[in-house]
Amino acid sequence: MREILHIQGGQCGNQIGAKFWEVICGEHCVDSTGRYSGTSSQQLELERINVYYNEAGGGRYVPRAVLMDLEPGTMESIRAGPFGGIFRPDNFVYGQSGAGNNWAKGHYTEGAELIDSVLDVVRKEAENCDCLQGFQVCHSLGGGTGSGMGTLLISKIREEYPDRMMLTFSVFPSPKVSDTVVEPYNATLSVHQLVENADECMVLDNEALYDICFRTLKLTNPSFGDLNHLISATMSGVTCCLRFPGQLNSDLRKLAVNLIPFPRLHFFMVGFAPLTSRGSQQYRALTVPELTQQMWDAKNMMCSADPRHGRYLTASAMFRGKMSTKEVDEQMINVQNKNSSYFVEWIPNNVKSSVCDIPPVGLPMASTFVGNSTSIQEMFRRVSEQFTAMFRRKAFLHWYTSEGMDEMEFTEAESNMNDLVAEYQQYQDATAEEYEEEEHDGEEEHA
């Protein structure tokens, strides 16, 4: 019932995805061979395990996951990794050539050749579902495969399953840490697609994750494994309500209804609490007020945009563990009252919370935060400036045009991204009075 089909693409997406499955397996007590190893008498972990797993013969649980890449490297390391044996072997779909950090290769040439084999696997998995709720895609926007082929897959799935939710976990290029020089091109072309074809995008970026590792977790030299662990904690938190019994449940669609006031503005900031360094865990008492306070803290956001520079249109919090819903509601109202200037006043009750009874492994309680803040425009604005600087000189364009792309497509993507920034700005500046006037104008026009 209510299954989610997980798709990971490119090196970044596959590494995040592999970590995510380790976390989910831990929560559902599934060992690395795919068998249930829990001891609890109620077996709560199994009650709705079919959201993410298929039950195969012999009591094995197989992830509903599709893994794709344009080169074999990452796939092979996942296969050799601790949970490599749990995936269905047919669900690894990969090419040999690589996309060379080129969006056009992922979207139009190399990726387009491989896409049909990926769609076959997606169809097979979707047919295995009782009532498919939607898809979750892990990818980065700076490279070639995750961004180019990832967005190609999203648009194809959109055509074939128009009424299913499409949730993405998208790793944006970081402001200071750059992997390749053409990141701004790849990211802008991807955002152009995500605005049109995705329903909900969780925006992540490495720099914010590094900052959390340095400042909060006190890690001296964090690895990608540490960063991916943070992301997977959040991914597990977003869907815990679907996988475990809870007092206030939410699913992908309810999340969307509560978070998206205007269809194009579906890029969210995410956060997770409690984040404590390994050494100081035993000195901290976890309480609902403390979770709430850390969760709303700007330092806790997993993307480099500061919520204090904008206003929240909407937000949603998912709490996990044994706690009183009344206390959760009081704390959330408290946050809104104390920081009312950071919330738009023309959407009353714009913060929702849900509570799930089962905490993550090793913690008594935890919470996940998803916010739709106008300050996310900082991310887009930054990428857009870098894009314009290069595009004005037509730098590196030949890599894209030689794969059959047209300059026009770049211009369209650029203006779509600039429109998005302008829309966020417009709603950031809007006040309740203006909003009412607009309503009246609208009514007069209809009359």
From Swiss-Prot:
Residues 428-447 are annotated as: Disordered. CDD domains: beta_tubulin. Tubulin is the major constituent of microtubules, a cylinder consisting of laterally associated linear protofilaments composed of alpha- and beta-tubulin heterodimers. Microtubules grow by the addition of GTP-tubulin dimers to the microtubule end, where a stabilizing cap forms. Below the cap, tubulin dimers are in GDP-bound state, owing to GTPase activity of alpha-tubulin. One of its GO terms (cellular component) is cytoplasm. This is Tubulin beta-4 chain. The gene is TUBB4. It is found in: Cytoplasm, Cytoskeleton. One of its GO terms (biological process) is mitotic cell cycle. It comes from the Eukaryota. Dimer of alpha and beta chains. A typical microtubule is a hollow water-filled tube with an outer diameter of 25 nm and an inner diameter of 15 nM. Alpha-beta heterodimers associate head-to-tail to form protofilaments running lengthwise along the microtubule wall with the beta-tubulin subunit facing the microtubule plus end conferring a structural polarity. Microtubules usually have 13 protofilaments but different protofilament numbers can be found in some organisms and specialized cells. Its main location: cytoplasm. Mg(2+) binds at E71. The keyword Metal-binding applies. GTP binds at Q11, E71, S140, G144, T145, G146, N206, N228. Transmembrane segments: none annotated. InterPro entries: Beta-tubulin_BS, Beta_tubulin, Tub_FtsZ_C, Tubulin, Tubulin/FtsZ-like_C, Tubulin/FtsZ_2-layer-sand-dom, Tubulin/FtsZ_GTPase_sf, Tubulin_C. Residues 431-447 have a biased composition (Acidic residues). Coiled coil: none annotated. Pfam families: Tubulin, Tubulin_C. Keywords: Cytoplasm, Cytoskeleton, GTP-binding, Magnesium, Metal-binding, Microtubule, Nucleotide-binding.
